[in-house]
Swiss-Prot record:
Prevents the cell division inhibition by proteins MinC and MinD at internal division sites while permitting inhibition at polar sites. This ensures cell division at the proper site by restricting the formation of a division septum at the midpoint of the long axis of the cell. The keyword Cell cycle applies. Keywords: Cell cycle, Cell division. The keyword Cell division applies. This is Cell division topological specificity factor.
């Protein structure tokens, strides 16, 4: 019985978080597509220097009163010791 209560709490928490994100995105005029593009660009840049868990990466926009912040949670698996220099 406890297991089902825990699952409901998790889905409730996740739904609440999704709603909060939708409201923040609406207030800041940030489309889900823009946020997804930003996430992809961050992955492209960061993977030059670090091995990350792309599936667990979270990028959100948060607002508090009159301030808006970009919040990124990027789990790092490994830091690359050398960086390949790209020449054009």
């Amino acid at each position: 019985m406890k297991l089902f209560g825990k699952e409901q709490q998790n889905s409730k928490t996740m739904a609440k978080e999704r709603l909060r994100l939708v409201l923040v995105q609406d207030r800041t005029n940030v489309s889900p597509e823009l946020l997804q593009n930003l996430k992809e660009d961050l992955i492209a840049v960061i993977t030059k220097y670090m091995e990350i868990d792309e599936k667990a990466l979270e990028v959100n926009i948060d607002s508090h009163e009159d301030q808006v912040a970009l919040i990124a949670n990027i789990p790092i698996k490994n830091v690359k010791r050398s960086v390949r220099v790209q020449t054009n």
